[in-house]
């Protein structure tokens, strides 16, 4: 039982590569693949992203002000991220424990905020340091996931002591936050430089925990 959460976005199509300028519906592919594999499409969260930052980073034609002045029929909105959530119905023999939220730690005001279909307050710069994992050919597409987004997913959909699985671990952001939220973690990653950085990040969390406990005892 339980859930899987997939972070994704639409993909840009370019004239040089695809013969046209537009967007490709990657989230739709993710939904169809999960449903075909027996998962239930459960929820979609839209993650707001600053279109000015996107324009400065990508120089996308549809976001340029000069394009608006020239021909606004080719202007478009910025591209948000999405978290797609899928639920697997458990069998009688393998039903997962429910995840119950304590009202003292998860008040109704917080739920009203997190139940919003658009999360406007995710800090896009709240990510693990990735400089050690960068290679020249990767710099354009390396995009670690925001830690506050990961924390919300872990707190919403798992209990303390549960195991969080990340089959595409990258530099270990999900694992870092899983440990910080008192969960266990299993991750896999094909790229060796990313894997080594993930190990460093997870060890850094362990060191941080050890030294934090030590200093609290001394204090």
Where are these regions (language model features)?
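Acidic, low-complexity intrinsically disordered tails
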Residues: 211-219
């Amino acid at each position: 039982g339980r859930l899987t959460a997939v972070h994704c976005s639409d993909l840009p199509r370019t004239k040089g590569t695809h013969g046209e300028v537009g967007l490709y519906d990657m989230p739709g592919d993710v939904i169809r693949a999960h449903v075909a594999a027996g998962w239930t499409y459960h929820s979609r969260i839209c993650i707001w992203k600053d279109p000015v930052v996107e324009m400065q980073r990508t120089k996308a034609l549809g976001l340029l002000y000069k394009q608006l002045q020239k021909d606004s029929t080719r202007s478009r909105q910025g591209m948000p991220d999405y978290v797609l959530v899928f639920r697997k119905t458990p069998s009688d023999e393998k039903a997962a424990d429910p995840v119950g939220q304590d009202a003292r730690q998860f008040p109704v005001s917080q739920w009203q905020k997190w139940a919003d279909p658009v999360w406007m307050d995710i800090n896009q710069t709240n990510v693990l340091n990735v400089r050690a994992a960068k290679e020249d050919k990767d710099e354009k597409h390396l995009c670690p996931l925001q830690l506050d987004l990961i924390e919300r997913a872990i707190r919403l959909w798992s209990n303390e002591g549960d195991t969080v699985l990340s089959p595409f671990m990258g530099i270990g952001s999900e694992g870092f936050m899983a440990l910080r939220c008192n969960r266990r973690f299993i991750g896999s990653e094909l790229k060796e430089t990313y894997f080594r950085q993930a190990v460093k990040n997870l060890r850094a969390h362990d060191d941080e925990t050890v030294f934090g406990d030590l200093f609290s005892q001394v204090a």
